[in-house]
């Protein structure tokens, strides 16, 4: 752990070296390419298949492709069609004979028959929507009838007026449309009957050619509609939201001051009584569709301190001794200093001179401490430790006579330079970075092998589409048991 922390702390330092940058680049490329190869090999998909097999059969979502899936949405009208004041009207039909419209707190019975209960001479004619106030006691009933009339296609300016019973009479409310297939109302009757077909799917037209036919609307609760508005009738009539949507579309030109339909699937931000509520009144309740909503400084003296088997080092020791002696005897006279120096030099050099004299007598090359040779590296300026140029028979040796010596020194110089460079690089390149580069390369090689081989990810029914997310067994059935075993041949498939 400490090595890893040190590695991250030294990132700004070792990135100054080109080699380190290369190692980092190689590591990143190897890791990224390795992950891509693993993904393309199908290993991840195969593991997901084993982990998730049989666990997604009940979610109702079928995956068709990589980014496409089969889904569904349920249209709910519960809040929209609730029986509250000023809610939208909703429609239902019972046995193709009785039609009902629920508007606010009121329910209306709609029938088509050949019986006329109203007469123009004795009842109220409705020429415009305001006249509905003479027929119905409650304003919420008036706007519902007004809306329904518009949905049927009634034109208040051009079409014949409707008839209604005056609200002061005890018999109850009644509104009548003449939709006969005769006389001068033939075209108007056809338009109203077509409106009924749009509002109520499966509407049966009982009108006969050449005979009278009327569409009547009664408010449930009045004496004239009591027999058909009981709970036994209304409980059997299931309000159909599709019919209601047809009703909304056909009534799109009708404006209601208490709630206005702004768009097909949205409402204005008001409360249930129509008062403005800036910021919304639980908007989800008013929607038709609600959703479940990253050199080492090696001087000649330093080398001689490590190795003293060189004539040059002997001479350096002599010079160094003399220098120290002069510092020690600084207050003595010059004569005494010279005498001491000569004495010391004689004591130190007697042994060397004796050895050289013996070598001279035996014709063996020796050093007279006057000339030295060394090997120099012309590019870097580094050189070897100077060595004495030997003498034999009074003359210096030819370079060819000690060729092996200077070739060996050259090899030592090169080795020393390489060792120095290696040590420098070792100091600047963390071992952790080298390890990362090595193992990332191994990871890339292994992933490349898996990518070339390929791993199957899931079963298919032979010759059919991808079954995801349903995981098939060898018999072609879903592992979770939602679908039976088809006993069709299956094949392992790579990707989908």
UniProtKB/Swiss-Prot annotation:
Zn(2+) 2 binds at residues 458, 460, 466, 496. A lipid is attached at residue 2 (N-myristoyl glycine). Disulfide bonds join 92-237, 135-164, 207-213, 282-295, 304-313, 367-388. Zn(2+) 1 binds at residues 57, 470, 478, 480. Pfam families: Arena_glycoprot (PF00798). Residues 33, 457-496 are cytoplasmic. Keywords: Disulfide bond, Fusion of virus membrane with host endosomal membrane, Fusion of virus membrane with host membrane, Glycoprotein, Host cell membrane, Host endoplasmic reticulum, Host Golgi apparatus, Host membrane, Host-virus interaction, Lipoprotein, Membrane, Metal-binding, Myristate, Transmembrane, Transmembrane helix, Viral attachment to host cell, Viral envelope protein, Viral penetration into host cytoplasm, Virion, Virus endocytosis by host, Virus entry into host cell, Zinc. This is Pre-glycoprotein polyprotein GP complex.
